[in-house]
Amino acid sequence: MPAAALLDDFLAFTLAGEAPAERDGACAGGAVRWQWLGDGLLAFEPAAADAAARASVLVSAGVHGDETAPIELLSMLVRDFAAGALPLACRLLVVLGNVPAMRAGERYLDDDLNRLFSGRHAQVPASREAPRAAQLEAAASAFFAAAPAGSARWHIDMHTAIRASVFEQFALLPHTGTPPTRAMVEWLGDARIAAVLLHTAKGNTYSHFTAEHCGALACTLELGKVRPFGQNDLTRFAPADRAVRKLVSGERAEGGATLPRVFTVIDQITKQSDALELFVAADVANFTAFARGTVLAQDGDYRYTVKHDEERIVFPNPTVKPGLRAGLLVVDTTRDTLAALV
């Protein structure tokens, strides 16, 4: 298939499952060099020689194959700067994550790809997601290893959520052992992200991997509800899309944007067995608040009771496999977190 088809509609090209006739070339009137690195993997770099100051940005979508809106936005981003309609001012790696699941219209085929990073894929060698997790780790590692010394490194991993949320668009920041950076929190404010969830333990997500192993400023964005391809109202994603476009084109974020509220994980509900009961409505929204003393879950001898004056539940899901997280509990830490930004 001609390379023009790859750049004009990266999504359709990837879903078709073909390789381009050329694996690299130039676009945007010769201003940008591109390289196809494999299914759903495209690298770009400005042809100009000012590499020393150039940021390295990884933008990913489709780590869950049914989260279509960010995939569509990412394909349009590629189209626009390949055509010269949007300048490219950074090294850029564009990733469509779980391509077989995208083709099937499923979240995943065997295992949640976003739980298989930082080497966890080695524990499930029979999983159809395991080789892809290893491939995405290798691609990110090689991309950031080639970054100019001292230059900025970013990873924006875009998702949509299965359920509604008190805050329709929110972000998750991986645990790094240090406070969040002002650059990331201000970028999230510019993207009109209403809330940020801070993890307090290492995880196996894509953004955890790039933060810990590649030194990237990394976040997972939850940008709304899961819908089939072609059924998304992309205007609802416009602020986040604009912020990503500013990041890759080198445009400064607007000053004075409202910073998001910040919530910190204080516990999780882990599914011990198939007897787990969650005492919340099946359609409870992410960030729904519960008062001290409320019993939220029971699983055999295990019981989770709210310990703070107010805790909010995020990602409740009793259908996960035993041993996996069935819900996160968070508390509001906005004041202390914003005061400690670095």
From Swiss-Prot:
It catalyses: N-succinyl-L-glutamate + H2O = L-glutamate + succinate. The keyword ATP-binding does not apply. Binds 1 zinc ion per subunit. Its cofactor is Zn(2+). Zn(2+) binds at residues 64, 67, 159. Its EC number is 3.5.1.96. Pfam families: AstE_AspA_cat (PF24827), AstE_AspA_hybrid (PF04952). Disulfide bonds: none annotated. The active site is at 222. The keyword Hydrolase applies. InterPro entries: AspA/AstE_fam (IPR050178), AstE_AspA_cat (IPR055438), Aste_AspA_hybrid_dom (IPR007036), SuccinylGlu_desuccinylase (IPR016681). Keywords: Arginine metabolism, Hydrolase, Metal-binding, Zinc. Pathway: Amino-acid degradation; L-arginine degradation via AST pathway; L-glutamate and succinate from L-arginine: step 5/5. GO terms for molecular function: hydrolase activity, acting on ester bonds; succinylglutamate desuccinylase activity; zinc ion binding. It is an enzyme of class 3 (hydrolase). GO terms for biological process: arginine catabolic process to glutamate; arginine catabolic process to succinate. PANTHER family: ASPARTOACYLASE, SUCCINYLGLUTAMATE DESUCCINYLASE. Belongs to the AspA/AstE family. Succinylglutamate desuccinylase subfamily. Transforms N(2)-succinylglutamate into succinate and glutamate. This is Succinylglutamate desuccinylase. The lineage of its organism: Bacteria, Pseudomonadati, Pseudomonadota, Betaproteobacteria, Burkholderiales.
